[in-house]
Each structure stands twice: as structure tokens, then as C-alpha cells.
């Protein structure tokens, strides 16, 4: 990754964020799900709105005792447009928020390539498609989030066994999971209900 002085790196980060939020990173041409969440909404309200938006997008939300493999609290299946949340999350609201935000990033990635197919597009690819950033700048955008959270090395180690495209999608989800308001905005901007 290209190491830039902090202020310059911050400018690239802010510019990338602005492009993601503006929809310039490649939103499908459908009608909007709804307006951005109110500024003073509680996190529970934001999560409930996100779940409502998923329903409007025809993304099935299932609550089950187990989702995926052992110790997995949630999964998003892009081929089926199906989100599974472990019922264990009901007892742990903060963890529920974190896990749901992580999975919502995967929904946004799926929206970037169209919910009607079984593929997704990484947010990084969406930024690259704008032509405004180099690969190094795009990588720095998400690594900045992970660095600021102090979990960069853990996430890199956890995702190292994945194929590169899957790894990129997971890095993005881990990077943005601690910013539920941003994830909500990405969902509203890039995931549209067909007219």
C-alpha cells in the first residue's frame, strides 16, 4: 500500500467516502428504498429501518439458532438474497448491531452488482470503476478504517485463507461494521427497490 502523509491520506479517504455516498461508485437504476435515517434516531431504530429496507428489497431475513458454520452469528447468501441472523444476537444488542452492520455491507456489495444475480461487486471495485482513484488509494481507504479500529492485523490474518475477491469483500465488511450510520447510508444510496 502506498503510504501517504496523514493529511493527504485523509483527503483520499474523505474523497472516496464522498463518492461511495453519492452513488457514483455504481448504483443500479432503481427507485430509492427511502430517505436516510433521521439524525437523532437510536441505533435500534436504525437497525429496524435497515431490516425493513431489506424486506422492501426482497431480501429474506431469517432468525435461527445457528447460521452457517460453528460460532457463526450471521450469514448473507447473495445467490438467495437471504440474511440469516442467529437468535443469540437478541440477547446481545451491541453485538447484534456490529454483526448486522457487517452483513449489511455484504448486501450493499450485492446491490452494486444487482440483487437479481448471484454475484456481488466489492466497494473497492465500485470506487475503481469511477476512475478517480488508483488501486493503492482504494486499498488505503478501507485499511484506514481498520487501522483506526486497531484490528487491522487480526482482520488480515482472519481473511488470509479466502480467495482475493472474497477477501476484499470481507475486509470491507470488517472495516465498516463499526460505522453503522455509514453502512445505513450506503444501503440507502446503493440498494434500490425495482419500480
Please tell me what each predicted stretch does.
Residues 11-22:
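Bacterial N-terminal signal peptides
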Residues 104-121:
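Catalytic Zn2+-binding segment of zinc metalloproteases
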Residues 2-13:
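Bacterial N-terminal signal peptides that target proteins for export
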Residues 93-108:
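Short alpha-helix carrying the canonical HExxH Zn2+-binding catalytic motif
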Residues 60, 68-72, 123-195:
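Metalloprotease/metallohydrolase-associated module, dominated by Zn2+-dependent proteases
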Residues 26-84, 88-92:
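Auxiliary, metal-adjacent structural segments of Zn-dependent hydrolase domains
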Residues 69-70, 95-97, 111-112, 122:
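Acidic/His-rich structured neighborhood in mature extracellular/periplasmic domains
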Residues 89-91, 114, 180:
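Solvent-exposed loop/turn segments at secondary-structure junctions
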